[in-house]
Amino acid sequence: MLPNQILTDITTVKHSFKAETFRPISTLSLSRNLSVSKFVPCLSKENKRDVLETIAKEFSNIEGEEFFVLPLKDLPIWQRECLLEHYLCPYDLSGSLEGEALIVNRAGTLLAGINLRDHLVLHGIDFVWQPEMLLQKLIDLDIRLQQSLSFAFSPDFGFLTTDPLRCGTALVARAFIHVPALRYRNKLSELLVPHQREFACSSLLPLSQESLGDILCLSNICSLGVSEEQILSSLRLVVSKILSAETEARNLLLKENSTEIKNRILRSIGMLTHSCYLDLQEALDATSWIQLGMSMQWIEDSEKHPLWSPMFWDLRRGHLALYNQDPANKTIEKEIIAQIRAQTTKPQAERLILRV
């Protein structure tokens, strides 16, 4: 179990970034497998424990960076969820958990998954849309680990992974973009059609098809036969296109001065101000409308605090448990979390000033 203070330090690092409204968030993942072991689906529990011990030992030897090894079987559910939320990791940790672990750095930007889909996944998050710098950090860590570990590699297929499409560079690059105006105007699908063979689209929650808070997640479909630089360059081009279209859509909404939009924004403020219970969908959708209103200068925060960026994470149940519950009595029980979520949004909504 990770001490609460360390977990709090890790999860609050994102609050220090005063990101612009449109700035995307990116995550990068490099998958690796030990050359001396079978792929994860073929491993026994004992073999998985051996892989975990081998890899974890190397992280403890890395100088200049403090890492925490967290076996999943010993990690409370709420801490697992909190870490996955913070790093925007698309993994389901409800399996056997034996021989599986997360390894996180003190800075709150790097995470390694052991025996999840592959023996090792090096994962990082970038809050200021500088994925090239994040990639270099992951590559440096990968090179350091390869000094002691031999990863499965083929001259023809690159790094070998459980999923054949993820061979090659074995890089998955994701961009999370807030696109409320495009969704409202039903313009998003036509923008994405030319890129559907190269990038997959999903929501904030990888196992859900529901759009949460008007967040679009783009990720490359294949890493075989393309370099890391090519993947990031293509992702930047698509994201830039979407951001330009979102800006244009917001300007049109502002010009139209739509009563319907204003009504949705005002109803969202009312919901966050007066609700006793809020599920995640309701809370993020309402927050998205409010953030849209703030970007159009129809709403102002009396304390000049950013709203969307912290709330993007802080309304999810792992973060709610961390920040709002007694250390000895943490729970992610649905009704309790819904009540805490409503209590969290109320003071945020009450300090908003209407300019419409």
Swiss-Prot record:
The keyword Kinase applies. It is an enzyme of class 2 (transferase). Its EC number is 2.7.14.1. PROSITE patterns: PHOSPHAGEN_KINASE_C. It comes from the Bacteria. Residues 22-249 form the Phosphagen kinase C-terminal domain. InterPro entries: Arg_Kinase, ATP-guanido_PTrfase_cat, Gln_synth/guanido_kin_cat_dom. ATP binds at residues 25-29, 172-176, 202-207. Keywords: ATP-binding, Kinase, Nucleotide-binding, Transferase. It holds the Pfam family ATP-gua_Ptrans. GO terms for molecular function: ATP binding; phosphotransferase activity, nitrogenous group as acceptor; protein kinase activity. Catalyzes the specific phosphorylation of arginine residues in proteins. Belongs to the ATP:guanido phosphotransferase family. This is Protein-arginine kinase. It comes from Chlamydia muridarum (strain MoPn / Nigg).
